[in-house]
Amino acid sequence: MNKFEDIRGVAFDLDGTLVDSAPGLAAAVDMALYALELPVAGEERVITWIGNGADVLMERALTWARQERATQRKTMGKPPVDDDIPAEEQVRILRKLFDRYYGEVAEEGTFLFPHVADTLGALQAKGLPLGLVTNKPTPFVAPLLEALDIAKYFSVVIGGDDVQNKKPHPDPLLLVAERMGIAPQQMLFVGDSRNDIQAAKAAGCPSVGLTYGYNYGEAIDLSQPDVIYQSINDLLPALGLPHSENQESKND
């Protein structure tokens, strides 16, 4: 029995699922840290912080940077820095800087993963409504989807500022299902992180976990999605469509 035979709509996470956004996010984080005269983190480290929205990303970046600065100063025999600005205020300042820099680098630092456009097109052609649920700040979402030429596939888009409770809370997924006019159990949610799978479980949606995303360095199977796929186009046979073999470059 096909466990997805009752699916009437599909919703996707964005970062780490449809797009590799780490280059742009890491560049903006590092520029913001540098502007505050803090150590820069680098893409490999920033990848482990992605997934809970920009505010949490800033908190993680600042916590690491302050600790790294303290370690560096101790190694050099220098006294620790006595911060005049409380950490909460530094997070707020860092977020404002990040938003400015990310607006400059988001498009050039974000790429579609292979098979994304073909898969979205095939699902849309089948008549399935498609939704997007991301914790990314809402103002960045629509321009990015347009630049990547995938905005046309989505009938519902929920950004991080569109709901009070972000993933892993179920509210964003429940809102998408409501706008699609279907029950949560009829909406398949596809993501790459434990936040995605936890949100799907809490909302009552069947879930697909993809192995190639970020997920804080954890294997997606630890979150126990209903199905695990290596590639996004593995969705197609599960939903009664032929498997797409068209290759798309990372820079498409």
Curated annotation (Swiss-Prot):
Single GO biological process annotation from the record: glycolate biosynthetic process
Active site residues of this protein: 13 (nucleophile)
Q: Name one GO molecular function term.
A: phosphoglycolate phosphatase activity
Q: Name the InterPro entries on file.
A: HAD-like_hydrolase_sf, HAD-like_sf, HAD-SF_hydro_IA, HAD_sf, PGP-like_dom2, PGPase_prok
| Cofactor(s) of this protein | chloride; Mg(2+)
Q: Which UniProt keywords apply?
A: Carbohydrate metabolism, Chloride, Hydrolase, Magnesium, Metal-binding
Q: How does activity depend on pH?
A: Optimum pH is 6.9.
User: Gene Ontology cellular component?
Assistant: cytosol
Range of residues in the leader sequence? none
Q: Which reaction does it catalyse?
A: 2-phosphoglycolate + H2O = glycolate + phosphate
Induction cue: Constitutively expressed.
Residues annotated to bind substrate: 13-15
Which class of enzymes does this protein belong to? hydrolase
Q: In which pathway does it act?
A: Organic acid metabolism; glycolate biosynthesis; glycolate from 2-phosphoglycolate: step 1/1
UniProt EC number: 3.1.3.18
Tell whether Metal-binding is among the UniProt keywords.
yes
Which residues are involved in binding Mg(2+)? 13, 15, 192
Keyword check for Hydrolase = yes
Q: Which family does it belong to?
A: Belongs to the HAD-like hydrolase superfamily. CbbY/CbbZ/Gph/YieH family.
Q: What NCBIfam families does the database record attribute to this sequence?
A: HAD-SF-IA-v1, HAD-SF-IA-v3, PGP_bact, PRK13222.1-1, PRK13222.1-2, PRK13222.1-4
Subunit arrangement? Monomer.
Give a short account of what the protein does. Specifically catalyzes the dephosphorylation of 2-phosphoglycolate (2P-Gly). Is involved in the dissimilation of the intracellular 2-phosphoglycolate formed during the DNA repair of 3'-phosphoglycolate ends, a major class of DNA lesions induced by oxidative stress.
- Stated name of the protein: Phosphoglycolate phosphatase
